[in-house]
C-alpha cells in the first residue's frame, strides 16, 4: 500500500507546488493576547485544504483509474445559525464510492443532509443550522478497487452578530483596566522562546512589553534558530545516483530521506527548470514508499539525457541520466512473397530503433502511400509494413526496405488466377434441321478458346459460329443434322499459365416429326375476293405439300403457296368457281383438311349510302320515325342498329325488322333526345356493311328575350330582342311580333311573314295610346312560346328638355328670408317645374331649397342667417330631363329693405 500526502502551511505568504498528484494549500492564522506575565493563546482559526491518496495496487489495468476529484470541496467560514454546503465531483474507473467524515472522529450530526445532485452530478454535504460544535475539518472520501482519494477541508463557525454586540456592550460598561506592569524575562534565550510562539506582526509589541529594545537583533537570532531547526529536520540516508539506460525504456531516480516535517516543500528539477509533472502527460511521475522518494521517467529518448535534481527545503541532490544510442539494424530479414492475382501482398520489417528516413522501393523506385500501396508503422515506430493491394502480374518484381544506409530486398511473385468455369457446357438435345447452342461462362475474360468435336478441332464457318464476349463463350451449330451429334469440348488458356482448362458436353440430334398445331378451317369467300387456307405446325423446319380433291397441286392457276416458318398458307388472290373443293396439307407424319366455298358478303348500294349521308331524316316531336335501308347479301346478315355509338335494343317505342332485302328501324312518339347519329351494321360470315344517317327530331324553338323599346314617336315604336337560347333542333327561321293595348287581352300580329333579325319598327299606332309588345320565334317545327311582354310605352313624339330660365332676380328680402322670381325658358319644351339651389358664402356645396320641383315662377327661401351672404341658381325640369342651371349674378345678404342690398 502506498500513501501520498500533500500539505502546505502558509503563515506569511502562499506558494504553489506542482506534482504528479494535485496541488494543495493549507492556510493558518493565529492571534495572541498578552495577559499579565503570560502569553495565552486566546483564539485560533485555520483554513485547511488537505489531500491524500492511499493506493491498494501499483499495477492498474488498462482503462481503469484511481479516484480523482474533478471539483474539490471548498473550505467554509460561516456564522452560527447559517448553513455550510460542501460539493464534490469525482471520476474514476471503477466508479468511486463517496462518504463524508469529520477529522475529529465525532459523527456528523443527524440533521446534516448527504445526497447526490443528479442534475449537476455533484456529491453534497449540507449542514444547517450551524453551531460552534460543527467547527472541524471534514473529509470527502472517494474509494474504488485501486485507491482511496481523501480531500479534507475546514469548516469554521464564527460567533453570531448578537453575541459580538453583547460583548462590546459589556466591554464598554466594565471599569477601567488597571495600568499594566512591565513584564520581565530572565534572559535573551527565554525571550526568543516567547517570540517563537507569537506572530511576526506582534514581535515589536511583545519586545516592548518585556523591555527588550534590540528588536532587530532578536529577529535575526530568531531566524537563525529556525533555520538550524529546519536544517536538522532533513536527513538524507541515500542520495540520488547517476543512471544509464537505453532509448524507449523507463528509468527511476530514487533517494531515501527522513523528514521531521512531512510537509516540507519538494521540487524535482531537470537542469535549471522545475519539472511540470502534472502537465507531462505521463512522461514524469513522482512516487513515495515510506522514506523512499522516486522520480519515474517513461519512454526515455535522447532528449531526456541530463542532470536531474531534487530540492528539499534548503538541500539539493543531483544525478545524471545518460541515454545510450543503439546502432540501427534490421531485426530479421524480408522474406519473398508469393500471391495470386487480386490478393494483397504484405512485406514487413522490424528495426532496432526508430528511423525517420525509412522508405519502401519497387524495382528501385520509391513508393508513396496511395490506393495501391498501404504503408504503415507500428505504435513503437519499429515495425514497418507495406501492403500491395489487388496484386497484378505487373506488380511482380523486387521490393526493398531502406533505412539510412541499410537495405533489405525481397521478391514478389504474382501468379495468375486459375481459370474456372462459372457455368459449364450443358448437354443439348435438338431436333433435326434446328440450331444447337453450347455456352459457358468463365471467371476471366482474358483467355484464348478452342472448340473440338470428338477430339477434332472445329473451324469457324457457315456450319459453326464461335462467339466470345467478356467472360461468356458459345458455339452455335446451324441446321443441325443427325451426323452433328457427338461430344463437344471447349479448351481455355491464358498467358503465363501453361495449364489447359476445359469443359465438355454431349449434343444429341433427334429426327424431326411434325404435328399440326393449328389446322385449316373451311373458307367461304365472295367471288373476286381474296381468300387463304392456313396450317400451323409445331416445327418450322418441316416441309409439306398441298392437295386439291386428293391430287397434289402442281399447276397453280390463281393460287400461291407460302411458307413462313411453321406457318404454311395456300392463298387465293381472287376467288372464282374453279377454286371450290376439298384441300389437304400433308407433312411428314401429319396432315390437315378443309373445304372452300363461294359466298357473298352483305352490301348496300352506294347511291343509298350517299343519300342517307347527305340528307338527315327529320321528324317532329311526338311523330313516328321510319328508317328503311335496302341491302344485298347471302346468307342473310345479322342486323344491328346503333345510336351515337350505343347499340339500339327493342323497347316500347322502338322496333326492328329484317327483310330479305332491307332493314327497318321504327321509333314512335319521338322526343328530342332521339336525335343523333344512327348506324346500321350488317354482318354475316363472309363480310359486313354499314350505313350512317342522322335522325333529327324537331320541336318549336324556346321563347325569345323580353323586347326592349328603343325609339318612340306618336305613330311608331321600335323594339329589339335576343334570340331564344333553345332553337328546338333547327335554325330559327324568323320572328312574329304581336302588340296589344295596355289592359287588353287581345294580341294582334304585326307581321304576316316571319321577321329576319331581332329588331322591328311597329307603325300605325294611335297617338297617346299605351301599348305592349311580344315576340314569337319560328323554326321548321313551327312557332314557339311567346316572350315576356315589353314594358308599356305611350305612342307620342319625344319631349325635349327645357331651356335656360330667364330673368332670375331678387324680389324681396328680410333678416331670415330672401324672395326670388323668374320667367319661363324661351327654348325647349315647357317645364313642369323648377329646381332652386343655394349656397352660403363660406361653402362651395349647392343644396336644393325644396325637396320637389317648384311649380310657379317665384319662391321665398326662409330660415336664413341674418346678414349672411347667399348665392342662388335655378334649373327648369320636365319629363325629358333637367335643363342647364342659371345663377344669380351676385350674392344676396339676408337683411330687410330699404333697397335690395347686393354686393
Curated annotation (Swiss-Prot):
Segments passing through the bilayer: none
Q: Which InterPro entries match?
A: FN3_dom, FN3_sf, Ig-like_dom, Ig-like_dom_sf, Ig-like_fold, Ig_I-set, Ig_sub, Ig_sub2
The Ig-like domain covers 67-158, 232-322, 418-508, 606-696
Pfam families named in the record = fn3, I-set, THB
* Assigned keywords, A-Z: Immunoglobulin domain, Repeat
Q: Which residues form the Fibronectin type-III domain?
A: 703-798, 804-898
Query: Coiled coil located at which positions?
Result: none
User: Domain of life here?
Assistant: Eukaryota
Q: Which Gene3D superfamilies match?
A: Immunoglobulins (2.60.40.10)
| Name listed for the protein in its UniProt record | Immunoglobulin superfamily member 22
| Annotated source species | Homo sapiens (Human)
Amino acid at each position: 500500500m502506498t500513501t501520498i500526502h500533500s500539505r502546505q502551511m502558509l503563515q506569511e505568504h502562499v506558494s504553489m507546488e506542482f506534482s504528479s498528484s494535485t496541488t494543495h494549500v493549507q492556510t493558518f492564522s493565529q492571534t495572541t493576547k498578552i495577559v499579565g506575565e503570560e502569553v495565552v493563546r486566546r483564539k485560533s482559526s485555520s483554513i485547511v485544504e488537505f489531500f491524500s491518496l492511499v493506493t491498494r495496487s501499483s499495477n492498474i489495468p488498462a482503462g481503469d483509474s484511481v479516484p480523482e476529484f474533478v471539483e474539490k470541496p471548498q473550505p467554509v467560514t460561516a456564522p452560527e445559525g447559517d448553513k455550510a454546503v460542501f460539493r464534490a465531483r469525482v471520476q474514476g474507473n471503477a466508479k468511486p464510492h463517496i462518504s463524508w467524515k469529520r477529522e475529529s472522529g465525532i459523527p456528523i450530526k443527524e440533521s446534516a443532509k448527504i445526497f447526490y445532485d443528479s442534475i449537476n452530478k455533484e456529491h453534497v454535504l449540507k449542514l444547517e443550522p450551524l453551531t460552534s460544535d460543527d467547527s472541524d475539518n471534514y473529509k470527502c472520501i472517494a474509494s474504488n478497487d485501486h485507491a482511496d482519494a481523501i480531500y479534507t477541508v475546514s469548516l469554521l463557525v464564527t460567533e453570531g452578530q448578537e453575541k459580538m454586540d453583547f460583548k462590546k456592550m459589556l466591554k464598554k460598561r466594565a471599569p477601567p483596566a488597571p495600568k499594566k506592569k512591565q513584564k520581565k524575562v530572565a534572559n535573551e534565550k527565554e525571550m526568543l522562546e516567547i517570540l517563537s510562539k507569537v506572530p511576526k506582526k506582534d514581535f515589536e509589541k511583545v519586545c516592548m512589553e518585556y523591555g527588550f529594545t534590540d528588536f532587530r537583533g532578536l529577529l535575526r537570532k530568531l531566524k537563525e534558530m529556525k533555520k538550524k531547526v529546519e536544517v536538522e529536520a532533513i536527513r538524507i540516508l541515500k542520495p540520488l545516483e547517476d543512471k544509464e539506460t537505453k532509448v524507449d525504456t523507463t528509468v527511476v531516480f530514487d533517494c531515501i530521506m527522513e523528514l521531521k516535517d512531512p510537509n516540507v516543500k519538494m521540487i524535482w528539477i531537470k537542469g535549471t527548470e522545475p519539472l511540470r509533472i502534472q502537465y507531462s502527460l505521463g512522461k514524469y511521475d513522482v512516487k513515495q514508499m515510506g522514506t523512499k522518494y522516486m522520480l519515474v521517467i517513461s519512454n526515455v529518448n535522447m532528449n531526456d539525457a541530463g542532470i536531474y535534481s531534487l530540492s528539499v527545503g534548503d538541500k539539493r541532490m543531483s544525478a545524471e541520466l545518460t541515454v545510450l544510442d543503439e546502432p540501427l539494424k534490421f531485426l530479421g530479414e524480408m522474406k519473398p512473397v508469393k500471391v495470386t492475382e487480386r490478393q494483397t501482398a504484405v512485406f514487413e520489417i522490424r528495426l532496432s530503433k526508430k528511423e525517420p528516413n525509412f522508405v519502401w522501393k519497387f524495382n528501385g523506385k520509391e513508393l508513396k502511400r496511395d490506393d495501391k500501396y498501404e504503408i504503415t508503422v507500428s505504435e513503437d515506430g519499429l515495425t514497418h509494413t507495406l501492403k500491395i493491394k489487388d496484386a497484378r502480374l505487373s506488380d511482380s518484381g523486387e521490393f526493398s526496405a531502406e533505412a539510412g544506409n541499410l537495405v533489405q530486398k525481397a521478391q514478389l511473385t504474382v501468379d495468375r488466377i486459375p481459370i474456372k468455369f462459372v457455368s459449364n457446357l450443358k448437354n443439348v438435345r435438338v431436333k433435326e434441321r434446328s440450331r444447337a447452342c453450347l455456352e459457358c461462362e468463365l471467371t476471366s475474360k482474358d483467355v484464348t478458346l478452342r472448340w473440338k468435336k470428338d477430339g477434332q478441332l472445329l473451324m469457324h464457318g457457315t456450319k459453326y459460329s464461335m462467339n466470345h464476349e467478356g467472360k461468356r463463350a458459345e458455339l452455335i451449330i446451324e441446321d443441325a443434322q443427325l451426323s452433328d451429334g457427338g461430344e463437344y469440348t471447349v479448351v481455355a488458356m491464358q498467358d503465363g499459365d501453361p495449364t489447359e482448362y476445359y469443359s465438355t458436353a454431349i449434343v444429341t440430334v433427334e429426327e424431326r416429326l411434325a404435328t399440326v398445331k393449328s389446322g385449316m378451317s373451311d373458307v367461304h369467300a365472295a367471288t373476286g375476293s381474296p381468300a387463304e387456307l392456313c396450317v400451323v405446325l409445331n416445327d418450322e423446319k418441316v416441309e409439306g405439300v398441298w392437295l386439291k380433291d386428293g391430287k397434289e397441286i402442281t399447276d397453280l392457276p390463281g393460287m400461291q403457296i407460302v411458307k413462313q416458318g411453321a406457318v404454311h398458307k395456300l392463298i387465293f388472290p381472287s376467288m372464282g368457281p374453279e377454286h371450290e373443293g376439298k384441300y389437304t396439307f400433308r407433312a411428314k407424319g401429319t396432315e390437315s383438311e378443309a373445304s372452300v366455298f363461294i359466298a357473298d358478303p352483305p352490301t348496300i348500294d352506294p347511291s343509298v349510302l350517299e343519300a342517307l349521308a347527305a340528307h338527315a331524316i327529320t321528324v317532329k316531336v311526338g311523330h313516328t320515325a321510319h328508317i328503311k335501308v335496302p341491302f344485298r347479301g347471302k346468307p342473310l346478315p345479322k342486323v344491328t342498329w346503333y345510336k351515337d355509338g350505343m347499340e339500339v335494343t327493342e323497347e316500347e317505342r322502338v322496333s326492328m325488322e329484317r327483310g330479305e332485302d332491307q332493314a327497318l328501324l321504327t321509333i314512335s312518339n319521338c322526343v328530342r333526345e332521339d336525335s343523333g347519329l344512327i348506324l346500321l351494321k350488317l354482318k354475316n360470315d363472309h363480310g359486313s356493311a354499314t350505313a350512317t344517317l342522322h335522325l333529327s327530331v324537331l320541336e318549336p324553338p324556346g321563347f325569345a328575350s323580353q323586347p326592349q323599346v328603343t325609339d318612340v314617336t306618336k305613330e311608331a315604336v321600335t323594339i329589339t330582342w335576343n334570340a331564344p337560347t333553345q332553337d328546338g333542333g333547327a335554325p330559327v327561321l324568323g320572328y312574329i311580333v304581336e302588340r296589344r293595348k295596355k289592359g287588353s287581352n287581345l294580341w294582334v300580329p304585326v307581321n304576316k311573314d316571319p321577321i329576319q333579325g331581332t329588331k322591328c319598327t311597329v307603325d300605325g299606332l294611335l297617338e297617346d295610346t299605351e301599348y305592349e309588345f311580344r315576340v314569337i320565334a319560328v323554326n321548321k317545327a313551327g312557332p314557339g312560346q311567346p316572350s315576356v311582354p315589353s314594358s308599356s310605352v305611350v305612342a307620342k313624339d319625344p319631349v325635349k328638355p327645357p331651356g335656360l330660365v330667364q330673368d332670375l332676380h331678387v324680389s324681396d328680402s328680410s333678416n331670415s328670408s330672401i324672395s326670388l322670381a323668374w320667367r319661363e325658358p324661351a327654348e325647349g319644351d315647357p317645364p313642369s317645374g323648377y329646381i332652386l339651389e343655394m349656397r352660403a358664402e363660406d361653402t362651395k356645396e349647392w343644396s336644393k331649397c325644396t325637396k320637389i320641383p317648384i311649380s310657379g315662377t317665384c319662391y321665398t327661401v326662409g330660415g336664413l342667417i341674418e346678414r349672411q351672404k347667399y348665392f342662388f341658381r335655378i334649373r327648369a325640369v320636365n319629363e325629358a330631363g333637367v335643363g342647364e342651371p342659371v345663377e344669380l349674378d351676385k350674392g344676396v345678404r339676408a337683411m330687410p329693405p330699404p333697397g335690395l342690398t347686393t354686393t
